[in-house]
Amino acid sequence: MSNRIFQRGDPIGHAFADPDLLAQALRHRSAGTPHNERLEFLGDGIVNLLVAEALYQRWPKADEGALTRARAELVREGALAVIGRTLNLGERLTLGPGELKSGGHRRDSILADAVEAIVAAIYLDCGFERCRAVVLPWFEASLAALPVGKAEKDPKTRLQEWLQARQLPLPNYALISESGDEHAKQFHVACILEQPVARAEGQGTSRRLAEQQAATLVIAQLDSRM
């Protein structure tokens, strides 16, 4: 994969003063040292703090349980992998030959780890305030699609309940493609609504995860129209 430096205008939203931090954040353990595992450790804590702070401020009446469930939904592996794809991290990862051959640049776990490592790299490059300003927009669509009191429900369930409450047709989930070896499958699914008209596509290491991602994006579309 190409390990080109992010420039202004890239989806990440930050130009690195220290490009070595970016290079390390994008280097998987399979490619040798220095790899991104220590940055991943630091980034995990920063992501949890940023998301927890955002939820605390946006949901002033939510109890601890609702906040905890919401944070878990937003920082889970699949959700972070969606962000990684949005940032085009897969094409920029440095992977060892084995991971390259097995499609590691598409794997949710590797993409999620890379997102956490990038967050840590931004923090070390420019400090917490700038890190918050860059990273929180990555979560905006997911935050908007996660109503208070329904954080324990998955996106497909929330979408179905939203449609049923309005006596509208249920969504259709269509498999667009299935690729990869048995141990590294990648599913591409579309979520299609007849009324109101909406469509979004999701990807994941299982059909269920791909459908959940697509449903999340459809919910974000519906919220933006209100």
UniProtKB/Swiss-Prot annotation:
Spell out the SMART domains in the cross-references.
Answer: DSRM (SM00358), RIBOc (SM00535)
What are its E.C. numbers? 3.1.26.3
Q: What highest taxon heads this organism's lineage? A: Bacteria
Q: Which reaction does it catalyse?
A: Endonucleolytic cleavage to 5'-phosphomonoester
Record-linked Pfam families? dsrm, Ribonucleas_3_3
Any one GO CC term of this protein is:
cytoplasm
Which UniProt keyword terms apply here?
Cytoplasm, Endonuclease, Hydrolase, Magnesium, Metal-binding, mRNA processing, Nuclease, RNA-binding, rRNA processing, rRNA-binding, tRNA processing
Give the Gene Ontology MF terms in alphabetical order: double-stranded RNA binding; metal ion binding; ribonuclease III activity; rRNA binding
Which catalytic residues are annotated? 44, 116
Q: DRBM domain: which residues?
A: 154-224
Predominant location: cytoplasm
Q: Which family does it belong to?
A: Belongs to the ribonuclease III family.
Q: How does it assemble?
A: Homodimer.
The name this protein carries in UniProt is Ribonuclease 3
Question: Gene name, please?
Answer: rnc
